[in-house]
Amino acid sequence: MTDQCVVSAPVRVRTRRLDVKETGALPAYRALAEHFGPDEVYLLESAAGPARDRRHQFVGFGALLSLSVTDRVVRVEGVPALRGLLLERAGALLEDGPQGLRLRTAGGLWPLLRAMRDMFDAEGSASGFRFGFLGFFGYDTARYIEDLPHLIENRPGLPDVRMVLHRGSVVTDLATGRCELLLHESPYWPGLAPETVTGLLADVEQAWPDPSADGFPASAVTDDSAPEVFANDVERCLKHIAVGDIYQVQIGHELSIRSTADPADVYQRLRGRNASPYMYLAGIDGHRLIGASPELFVRIEDGEVTMRPIAGTVPRSGADGGIAAGVRLRSDPKEIAEHTMLVDLCRNDIGRIARPNTLDVPDQLDVEGYSHVLHLVSTVVGRARVDTDAFDTIAALFPAGTMTGAPKIRAMEIIESVERSRRGLYAGALGLLDVGGYTNLALCIRTLFHHEGVYRTRASAGIVADSEPGAEWTETLAKMSATHWAVTGEELL
């Protein structure tokens, strides 16, 4: 908890709000990324889905402070005064190591994140995002919660966890169309004239050309698995299920696509092909994250914790737009059983931090459609206890049971023994954390990771007792079809 950290005077922050002309999220991103650099700009938008998930779009810019943790090694970058203050506050949690500062214990991650949050005296919010951080929680964040085996080789790349404070954002209310420029000001960092940003936005072309019009760049695709290899993996999992080791486990594989395609163009194509509630385009250390996730990991709003687990998937097909496939999905005993099991796991996870008698499942077994697949979706809610915060909630829920299986820890152990490459941010979470408690994190699926001319995308299938290997392989291809097409212009199925 924060009592392990030095409590120095917080950084006072004032937020200026100015109405600006609405430009569209991607054109604004392109203009701001050209000025500030793509590592310092992010785009989050809701392009489809239920109204409760389609509220705002954000384009943040100008990184002031970033905290990254990889294998317990801690890296803090940004404005020197902010960097020094965070290290002062968190010093008791850190020690010197061969690669620099590192966490004394894995569990020290959570008080470290609290130390960063509590540095600021700002107008935060429990009901929406005003001032806070863009947060990335990779799948291996689980290692800061549970003691898990480490059998798959690490590869250089994204950190396990990263939190970034930006100096401002362009926020559009999708219900009203109102667009605001938020600028955060403090004596701790140089000021930024609003005219700098409004001038950039004034020159934006809203009707950006379709990047598919001139065709797609040449690409070369490799897979870290194959149908027969994946079938053997499924059989291994079925043996674990047969002896009662697990009830369900999510296993997958990864495609690597070498291409010269521009990440912003890929995002534009993905958005056009597979508009989703949780879309993102962001940079970390020269990597680009491009996603069209259908699934909420967790939203914390005015003390209410919400998860919307997706479990149960069929390819979208047929002249009726998938209506018949949706009816079959909602009446398939295998899919219903798998979904119910994972909804129960969500209830269990939320119950760890919820007030008594507040758990509820207000929506069950809804069918939601996307470009290539149909999903079964439910909503699970609970009221957070007053002695918990956003980081307690994330630690209690992470990783999403829909990406591991049940029981969760044993499923993660089996995933580590079966899969061939580390998941990275895939199956983790990405989104916004306000200093006032509001949190909105998407589950990182239907995602591309771009670095040095290579795009990687990944998908998993849920293995249960009556799974058929060929069908599960096809499900993974259906889930990767939109991201694969956005880079290559070619269908997987």
Swiss-Prot record:
Q: Name one Pfam family in it.
A: Anth_synt_I_N
The main enzyme category here is transferase
Which cysteine pairs make disulfide bonds?
A: none
Q: What is the lineage of its organism?
A: Bacteria, Bacillati, Actinomycetota, Actinomycetes, Kitasatosporales
Question: Which metal ions or organic cofactors does this protein require, according to UniProt?
Answer: Mg(2+)
Instruction: Enumerate the UniProt keywords alphabetically.
Output: Antibiotic biosynthesis, Magnesium, Transferase
Protein name, UniProt field? 2-amino-4-deoxychorismate synthase
Entry's EC annotation: 2.6.1.86
SUPFAM superfamilies (alphabetical): ADC synthase
Protein purpose: Converts chorismate to 2-amino-4-deoxychorismate (ADIC).
Annotated family: Belongs to the anthranilate synthase component I family.
UniProt keyword annotation of Magnesium present:
yes
Q: Which reaction does it catalyse?
A: (2S)-2-amino-4-deoxychorismate + L-glutamate = chorismate + L-glutamine
GO terms in the biological process aspect are:
antibiotic biosynthetic process; L-tryptophan biosynthetic process
Superkingdom of the organism of origin: Bacteria
Q: Which residues form the signal peptide?
A: none
Organism of origin: Streptomyces globisporus
What is a GO molecular function of this protein? transaminase activity
